UniProtKB/Swiss-Prot annotation:
It comes from Escherichia coli O9:H4 (strain HS). This is Thiamine kinase. Gene3D superfamilies: 3.90.1200.10. The lineage of its organism: Bacteria, Pseudomonadati, Pseudomonadota, Gammaproteobacteria, Enterobacterales. GO terms for biological process: thiamine diphosphate biosynthetic process; thiamine metabolic process. Its EC number is 2.7.1.89. Catalyzes the ATP-dependent phosphorylation of thiamine to thiamine phosphate. Is involved in thiamine salvage.
Amino acid sequence: MPFRSNNPITRDELLSRFFPQFHPVTTFNSGLSGGSFLIEHQGQRFVVRQPHDPDAPQSAFLRQYRALSQLPACIAPKPHLYLRDWMVVDYLPGAVKTYLPDTNELAGLLYYLHQQPRFGWRITLLPLLELYWQQSDPARRTVGWLRMLKRLRKAREPRPLRLSPLHMDVHAGNLVHSASGLKLIDWEYAGDGDIALELAAVWVENTEQHLQLVNDYATRAKIYPAQLWRQVRRWFPWLLMLKAGWFEYRWRQTGDQQFIRLADDTWRQLLIKQ
């Protein structure tokens, strides 16, 4: 149920107008993108979300609602309400673990997602890389950062191996181990892109786990594993630059020291992989 309004409303107004019988249960602060909170009434639970980035255009939040509206409920929460600065979606019962599931199980989830109809908007990384450079702390901008940005701009993004709907933020904290199988939450970066970009972006523990995930996916997708791994590797510098830039951007927004530590660690990874 989308609801358009140019006037933002408070949490209490949202609940009294649309969910008068529900009451807040708990607040979630997991992840790097910010929190959300849970509401409940007679055993029925919804998650109330807000945009993680206060400076992002409202269209980005609306796209998340549209993505959830077209995804099957077996892999994503069903949305119930959208309006300016608020979205209400199903609560997914299950365990959120601190480590990734078996690579074959995760490959199955991603392959199923990639078989769904496309969302209708492309993920393009270069505009984001440039935005993060422009919006970062000037004291943190280095010659090396600018050099890598120019190098990627000249090289252009890898040509997609297969174009599919992507989640683009797959890590242990965004995976719900439910009774009916794995499901994904936090779809704010979803869009259409290369399947290899999705695989490159998964927050794996080590290269061995990454290779196994790619091999398991390649088996399902009937792609030569070596071919898929080469394409995944082509995306590595783009993904590392994206992560480093996002951490720098969030550092300037929030002043949270964790983002500086994560940015520094990602810059070191970039130097190693060059």
